[in-house]
Amino acid sequence: MKLFVLCIFAMMATLAMSRSWTYVQPKFLNKAFEVALKEEIIVRWDRKLAKWLRVNGGPLSHVQKKALYFVNRRYMQTHWANYMLWINKKTDALGRTPVVGDYRRLGAEIGRRIDMVFFYKFLSGRNMIPKYMPYMEQINRMRAADIPVKYMGK
């Protein structure tokens, strides 16, 4: 139930960001570009979570804190196609061939713009942090670059 509610909120945030249901036409994405995006997004969100945990994480158990790190990774996986929609617009607007630095900058902007602190407050305030499961541990142990997403490059 907790994970279901989390998914509903993730869907609402996606709709608020995209303002429409749009099919993202698959487009070749270089593996280096994908890695740069993932690393920057996760680094920004993990920083926000670490800062939030320092201030508000006292009542949370160690397992609940690990579950919140999983929330970061699952949120990125869930919304990857929408991020690519936005990234395609931004890279097309460059007027040149994008480089890894452009994707790092865009990943950092996604990580900065999306207010994950709202989700941490919501989940912890309503005691809705998902129960920590073995599959969560597997994803948490992965490097940001290795987290599987749909719409991957070749």
UniProtKB/Swiss-Prot annotation:
Keyword line: Fertilization, Signal
GO CC, any one term: acrosomal lumen
Superkingdom of the organism of origin: Eukaryota
Any one GO BP annotation for this protein: single fertilization
Signal peptide start and end residues: 1-18
Expression tissues: Sperm.
Keyword Signal among UniProt keywords: yes
Biological role: Dissolves the egg vitelline layer nonenzymatically during fertilization. It creates a hole of about 3 mu-m in diameter through which the sperm pass.
UniProt name for this protein: Egg-lysin
Organism listed in the record: Haliotis kamtschatkana (Pinto abalone)
Organism lineage: Eukaryota, Metazoa, Spiralia, Lophotrochozoa, Mollusca
